[in-house]
Amino acid sequence: MTKTADLKGSNFTLSVLHLPNDDVALALSMLEQKVAQAPSFFASAPVVVNIENVSNEINFVELKSGVERTGMIPVGITGCKDKQKQAQATAAGFAVMTSFTPQQVTQKANMQPTKVVKTPIRSGQQIYAKDADLVILNHVSPGAEVIADGSIHIHGTLRGRAIAGASGQAEAKVFCKNLQAELISIAGNYWLSDQIDKEYWHQNVMITMVEDRIQIDTLTL
């Protein structure tokens, strides 16, 4: 029997660039700085632009080309009810996306056994625990990336990037013995190294999501 193409709805985690005003150049400058801090994380990553707080006209062509120059892929705009702006955004190549409150993923459906890695994770390496928790019994070097659909436990120093809840599980956590991360992320919410308070640097910590915000707590164990 011949199979045919099928079109289904799905949920994806997307980065959102929030514009505080119509100064596109300033927003793009900020985006370039963020991408420069973790280029492999943001490379070819889709991004949505939220223009809810912009009351003036926007140069959507400049906005789209500027985002593309950073290496990210602009897929659409959100926060816009103005039909004229929607038409301008569409003409520039943006999709117009409806804002919504995503349902939190609470079920750990089809979770697999925990993936355990005993060796150091070296620069340029990527480890992914699909539908599972991830345990690293060693260090994660700068430029390395560890990803899990569940939680991540690092029994060493985290100098690279840790991405937990990659499939959208907001209850996922990151544990590490020594926090020096380039980037930490849970369910699509991320902090770069400059957003991590220095009081948590070099500390044994637990990283969670609380009320849609990343929270870091030191552990005494």
Curated annotation (Swiss-Prot):
The keyword Cell cycle applies. GO terms for biological process: cell morphogenesis; division septum assembly; regulation of cell division; regulation of cell septum assembly. It comes from the Bacteria. Interacts with MinD and FtsZ. Cell division inhibitor that blocks the formation of polar Z ring septums. Rapidly oscillates between the poles of the cell to destabilize FtsZ filaments that have formed before they mature into polar Z rings. Prevents FtsZ polymerization. PANTHER family: SEPTUM SITE-DETERMINING PROTEIN MINC. This is Probable septum site-determining protein MinC. It comes from Aliivibrio fischeri (strain ATCC 700601 / ES114) (Vibrio fischeri).
